[in-house]
Curated annotation (Swiss-Prot):
It catalyses: (R)-pantoate + beta-alanine + ATP = (R)-pantothenate + AMP + diphosphate + H(+). The keyword Ligase applies. (R)-pantoate binds at Q61, Q153. It is an enzyme of class 6 (ligase). ATP binds at residues 30-37, 147-150, 176, 184-187. It is found in: Cytoplasm. One of its GO terms (cellular component) is cytosol. GO terms for biological process: pantothenate biosynthetic process. The lineage of its organism: Bacteria, Bacillati, Bacillota, Bacilli, Bacillales. CDD domains: PanC (cd00560). It holds the Pfam family Pantoate_ligase. This is Pantothenate synthetase.
Amino acid sequence: MKIVTTVQEMQHITKELRASGKSIGFVPTMGYLHEGHATLLRKAREENEIVVLSVFVNPLQFGPNEDLDRYPRDIDRDENVAKENGVDYLFYPSVEEMYPVEQTTTVEVVKRTDVLCGKQRPGHFAGVATVLMKLFNITLPTHAYFGMKDAQQVAVIEGFVADFNIPVTIVPVDIVREEDGLAKSSRNVYLSQEERKEAPHLYRSLCMAKERIEAGERNAEIITTLVKEYIETYTKGTVDYADLYAYPSLQVVDQIEGRIILAIAVKFENVRLIDNITLTVK
């Protein structure tokens, strides 16, 4: 595995690889890698001749009062996970390397961002889309891999890639969970011992909702109310949202049909956790 820290070198490498006809699987991350990231890397390894991993904590996607400065970082751990999962190139640029001068251009996302995390975090998806536009142009991937834990992000990225005719296939990958159902996340380290015991109830609330839908419930408001009440009963967390939308359009639905997403965000004392399920309802 080769570690690359400059845009110029990474772009030179990937240009040569693409010119020689190689397929490139790209996994963009903010580091502090866990089994969810490893799953993305393994899928990229299975489906491509070359695997490129980026580790970059992107300041553009953090709001003024968010956790940019304390976001967990451990490059030694990340290198080990990368090597264990067959990464060929680890792209590890500094903020100064990615943004040597103030951006004169950013990508504004105008659809799919006024609900869920986009509603709570204005400007977040513009930051995500801007850094991905840069990373796609630097790594020149044929395929890019994203976890469905942030399903709204996947929907936004699919739309932005289609809108700009970017020649990359977006590959969504299922959420990876702990044995008790908690979605794996770099931010889980912020949970207190008691909160960690409560956190699996997020997924249990989604499973309960899925059972009700499969049993015939089609009223979206009834389902989201059930989820909120369950989480408020079994955790001390504050429900930021528990919403149900058509997917990937993220249009509001009153009656549940077609492909839908049920997504939640819950604030604990030092961390905000998200989770979701997607299902197709006939």
